[in-house]
Structure formats: structure tokens, C-alpha cells
Amino acid sequence: LKDDLNDSITEDDAVEMLAQHIITRPVFEVLFEGHQFTSENPVSRAMQRALDVLDEANLDKESKDLEKFYASVRMRASGITDPQAKQRLVVELYEKFFAKAFKRTTDKLGIVYTPVEIVDFIIHSVNEVLQQEFGQTLGSEGVHIIDPFTGTGTFITRLLQSGLIAPEEMEHKFRHEIHANEIVLLAYYIAAINIEAVYHGIMGGDYVPFEGICLTDTFQMYESDDLVSRYMPDNSERRKRQKASDIRVIVGNPPYSIGQDSENRSEERRVG
């Protein structure tokens, strides 16, 4: 985690990330039944391996108090087949439950989510500049796009839904030329699922993982080599591919936090 995120990750941070995984996995399994995210995503697999080692401590009992919550999610999710409706439910859960359950993380990292209208304006403005100045579009082959602070994936999902990427361009763009980074585990999970669900809704067919997303600190990832890649090899490999890519377009909204009066001022300076 120190390698993939940053050197300031503490033991408490690691414990909280495992707690996030324990709490959220049942939610995603309910919302995206049959979806292969939890078995295919490299970070989810790495977290699950750590929990498998800890199973002897009967960790399941720690989440039994949440059974009513999981049951309510199952009830709300039953019958929802529209990917956008599931997206809305996931983001609502994040805003009303997850962000409050892990308030220290959200306060520390200054998490802010951009209104969809602003996201759409930014995406279309970038496409116009590409056309006017470079004779290309966001769908053009060779135009690598990154959202370095993806949050729950709104910029990427709206890009896919924008109509600016032609149907014949979509598969190549999705598989090879769209990149996203996120440092908060919960948001990373939600972003990956949202992006994959939107792509599947557009293209249909079999499940296709979004291999362009990394659990990483964008500010730190260019400052050191992979030192412990054996622990999260697939995520580290994604980071290496991203660093080797010729990024042409950066879209997004950097996280910020105002008025912090704690040790977390160091986080402010990282974004500042």
C-alpha cells in the first residue's frame, strides 16, 4: 500500500481499508449480482487475500450488525436492471452511508464531487479544443485520456455516455486509452464498477474489466519505482502501463479541503 498509494499510509489506514472492503463487498455483490468485479479487480482480489488469512479470527461476526443494512440494500436493488439506476443507488449509498462511516478518510482527503452539468461542460469543451487546435477528438486513436482524481468515476462515465466517442472507437478507447486514478478504496471500487457498468450498457456482450483504473496517489506515483509490487502485482502493472502512456488529455477536479486544523494539513500541501 505504501508503494501503490504513498509513504504516509499507516497501519491504521491499512486496517480501515480492510474494513471498507469487508463492509462494501456484500453491497456490491447484491447490487451487481453476476458481475465479476470482486473476482476480477486486482485490488479487490488483493484485499480478499488479506482477509482470507484473517478468517480464523471470525471477522464475519464484525459485520453481522450490518445485516439489516444489507437486507435493505437487497430490497432496494431487487428489480433494478438499468445501469444508471444502479449507479445512482451506489453513489447515494456512498454519500449517505459510506462517507459517514469512514468520515476520517473523507475529511482527510478533502473529497468533493463535481456536478454532472459541470462535468459535461468540461468534457465537451475539451473535445472542441482538440478539434480546433489539433484536428482530433476524444475518440481519436492515440489520444490517451486520464482523470487523475476520479472519485466515483463521473468524468469517465460521462465521457463514455457523451456520444463524443464513436461506436467503432469505443472498444479500443476503453481498453487502451482511458485512464483513471483514485486513492480512496471505497471510491475506487465504486468508480470501477460504474465505469464497467456504463461500458457494458453501451456495448453489451461479455463482462470487460476496466483495466485503466489504478488505486494510487497521482501526486506520488511518479516519484518512486515499484518497491513492493509483489503484494499488488496487477495494480502495480497497471500503474507502469499508465506511466508509459503518452497522456494527451487530463480531465477532472482535484480534491481539496478547506480549514483543516489537524495533522492532515500535510494532505493540503500535497494538493496545494
Regions found by a protein language model. Give the residues of each.
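Non-catalytic, mostly N-terminal accessory regions of nucleic-acid modification and defense proteins
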Residues: 1-117, 199-212
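SAM-dependent methyltransferase catalytic region
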Residues: 85, 97-270
